[in-house]
Structures are given as C-alpha cells and as structure tokens.
Swiss-Prot record:
<dbReference type="Pfam" id="PF02525">
    <property type="entry name" value="Flavodoxin_2"/>
</dbReference>
<dbReference type="InterPro" id="IPR029039">
    <property type="entry name" value="Flavoprotein-like_sf"/>
</dbReference>
<dbReference type="InterPro" id="IPR023048">
    <property type="entry name" value="NADH:quinone_OxRdtase_FMN_depd"/>
</dbReference>
<keyword id="KW-0288">FMN</keyword>
<feature type="binding site">
    <location>
        <position position="10"/>
    </location>
    <ligand>
        <name>FMN</name>
    </ligand>
</feature>
<comment type="function">
    <text>Also exhibits azoreductase activity. Catalyzes the reductive cleavage of the azo bond in aromatic azo compounds to the corresponding amines.</text>
</comment>
<comment type="similarity">
    <text>Belongs to the azoreductase type 1 family.</text>
</comment>
<protein>
    <recommendedName>
        <fullName>FMN-dependent NADH:quinone oxidoreductase</fullName>
        <ecNumber>1.6.5.-</ecNumber>
        <ecNumber>1.7.1.17</ecNumber>
    </recommendedName>
</protein>
<dbReference type="GO" id="GO:0016655">
    <property type="term" value="F:oxidoreductase activity, acting on NAD(P)H, quinone or similar compound as acceptor"/>
</dbReference>
<keyword id="KW-0520">NAD</keyword>
<dbReference type="GO" id="GO:0010181">
    <property type="term" value="F:FMN binding"/>
</dbReference>
<keyword id="KW-0560">Oxidoreductase</keyword>
<feature type="binding site">
    <location>
        <begin position="15"/>
        <end position="17"/>
    </location>
    <ligand>
        <name>FMN</name>
    </ligand>
</feature>
<feature type="binding site">
    <location>
        <begin position="139"/>
        <end position="142"/>
    </location>
    <ligand>
        <name>FMN</name>
    </ligand>
</feature>
<comment type="function">
    <text>Quinone reductase that provides resistance to thiol-specific stress caused by electrophilic quinones.</text>
</comment>
<dbReference type="GO" id="GO:0009055">
    <property type="term" value="F:electron transfer activity"/>
</dbReference>
<dbReference type="InterPro" id="IPR003680">
    <property type="entry name" value="Flavodoxin_fold"/>
</dbReference>
Amino acid sequence: MSSILLLTSSPRAESLSTPIAVELAEKLKNQNPGSFLVRRDLAASPLPHIDDLFTGAIRKPAEARTAEEVAAVKTSDELVNELFAADTIVISTGLINFNIYSSLKTWIDNVARAGLTFKYTESGPVGLLTGKKVYVVLTSGGVYSQGPAAPLNHAVPYLKSVFGFLGITDIETIYVEGLAFGPEAAEKAIDAAKMRVQEIALAA
C-alpha cells in the first residue's frame, strides 16, 4: 500500500500541466491497489502565506503555543503530515517568469519547517523526508530543458534544491515544452509527456 500526494498549482482553466499530473497520479494509484491519493489544488484553494504570527509560533514547542498560534500553524501541520505520509509526490506547475507558480511556493513555505521536515546538526542541515519520489510536470511556451534558454529555467533547480534540503533527492521532471511553437510542436510535446507518464505507471 502506498500514498500519493498530488499538488496542482496552475490557475489556468485550460492548464496542460494539471491534466498530465492528474493522469500520472491516477495511473500510479491504479497500478497499486489499495493506494491512497490525496490532492491539493493550490490554485483553487490557496494556502495562507506565512506571516509574523506563524513565524513566531513555529519557533516555539507545540505545547507552548497560544490558541491563536496553534490556529496559525494548523494548516501547515496538516500539510506536513500529508507530506510525511506520501511515498510519491506528483507536482504540476507552469514556468512563470522563469520559476514556479506562487501557489506552489506558498506550499513549500508551509512545509519547510526546522525540526519537522529538516533539522540542523553540528555537521549541517539534514533533511527528514527520505525515501520519497517526486515527479514534476513542468509546462512552458518555450524550450527550457536545454539550449540557450536553459539558464533561465530556475524552477527545476529550485525544486531540486528545496526538496534535496528536505531529504528528497529522487526527482524526475516531465517537460511539456515548446507549447508556443505552434499546434504541431504542442501536440508532439504533449504526446511525449503522456508516453513518459505511461512508462512510469507501467514500471510502478
């Protein structure tokens, strides 16, 4: 039995990253009978941005927090629990201004918590979320996986850095790119992504 956490972040009704990520998550679930699938639509149900109350609360032991502080970290605690429970995390995002959607960044801000998902030691920080797999479905109008525009792709390096900091190093990006290069190029990119989704599901 496994648990899959699906995070979709596109605000676009005609998003291409969302259906491909959903398809991957559903196929992984179907390949493993009894698996659980938890979905967070970060665009439709935006998470609270961290604020002064939140940052003060997470620096205290849980038993020392006021009722107001407990309420301030309640959603974050739920997100952290979902992340710990997941064996596989499927993420969808478009490349917006060379990075991820802000809704996904807010999720990261809520789950990257010292003492919970990582800790500091004498030899440096240690991630506490080990043994997990992350799939990132990344859409873009241009081509950013390689070529002259690749240095502008800050999304993938950022996600690898932050998840690596939390202890997750097994990360695969499924690029759906060149979507602005005409219908034929878009269709080719989508077909390639769906083929990779099928390969991943069959190997699960």
